[in-house]
Amino acid sequence: MTVQINKLDPDAAIDIAYDIFLEMAPENLDPADIMLFNLQFEERGAVEFVETADNWDEEIGVLIDPDEYAEVWVGLVNENDEMDDIFAKFLISHREDDREFHVVWKE
C-alpha cells in the first residue's frame, strides 16, 4: 500500500525555510556573511524553491527520496538573476505530521 504524500506548495516551503534561516543563521554563518546578507537582501536577496537534488546523501549521510522532500535555497542573486552566493540549502520533508529538515550552511 502506497501512502499519498501531500507535497508542500512552493510558498509554504519557502516560508518554512526562511523562518528557520532567520532563527539559525546567527549560530551557523560567519558574522561577515550575516552582515552581507542583511545589507544586500533588500536589493539582491532571494529564497528559491528548486528541484530537489538527488545527492543529499553526500551532505547528510543518508539516502533520501527526492519526491518526499522540498529543496529551498537562501542567498543573493547577481545582475543576471542567478543565485551566486548561497547562504543555506534546505531539505524539508513534505510530511506535515513528521516535518524534518536538513540544512547545509555556507562555509
UniProtKB/Swiss-Prot annotation:
Disulfide bonds: none annotated. Pfam families: DUF440. InterPro entries: dsDNA_mimic_put (IPR007376), Put_dsDNA_mimic_sf (IPR036763). It comes from the Bacteria. Signal peptide: none annotated. Coiled coil: none annotated. HAMAP family: Put_dsDNA_mimic. May act as a double-stranded DNA (dsDNA) mimic. Probably regulates the activity of a dsDNA-binding protein. Belongs to the putative dsDNA mimic protein family. NCBIfam families: PRK05094.1. This is Putative double-stranded DNA mimic protein MS1016. It comes from Mannheimia succiniciproducens (strain KCTC 0769BP / MBEL55E).
